[in-house]
């Protein structure tokens, strides 16, 4: 079954196909689709910024549509990034600008690479707010940072050697290892004694705090309410 999180209709079709299949209940759901500023620009057919819809809104619809099919003690992981809190030398004044400005950015914001950082912040807001709203204390919902990985297709093959060198030289603490991060992600899904909920795991099975901005409950609620208004016709 195919799914494209940059299309709400595609997400709806996937959910319909899954419900009509014989797969049954879902134990684990990993929301890993994503593009960066290097590969994503413009609007989707739904009229939203392509990074916002691919990285956040499509997952928002997917998770909420599949919640009734989740095992009671299942696990959901939203793949975010430590770039939800960009380095100060990258942007010293990174503040929440409002969900609508991210979903339908003006000309200046539509060209900004900060759209990726904001989308990863949205992943964390979604994680925290989802836990508050579902009321299922057995369903474990967490966020994960795999680290910077130029060997993946996050940038659509458009990342340059110069950019890779820049990250390694200026942000070495943010570089990830594909094998190690993949294993950590698998462990977070399969570990039998795992009990953590609402945490952010950084390239391992050890959780760390997210940015101060990410704990703003007002922002998280605003994002949820607006996202719900955008996807309500696709359930």
Indicate where each model-derived feature is located.
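Rossmann-fold NAD(P)H-dependent dehydrogenase/reductase core
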Residues: 1-153, 233-235
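Surface-exposed beta-strand-to-loop junctions
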Residues: 42-43, 105-106, 162-164, 203-207
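Aromatic-acidic/polar surface patches that form glycan- and anion
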Residues: 52-55, 115-120, 173-178, 216, ...
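Alpha-helical membrane-targeting segments
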Residues: 107-109, 148-150, 155-177
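C-terminal/domain-terminus segments
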Residues: 143-149, 200-212
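C-terminal helical subdomain
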Residues: 167-208, 217-219
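Hydrophobic "lid"/C-terminal helical patch
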Residues: 185, 189, 223, 227, ...
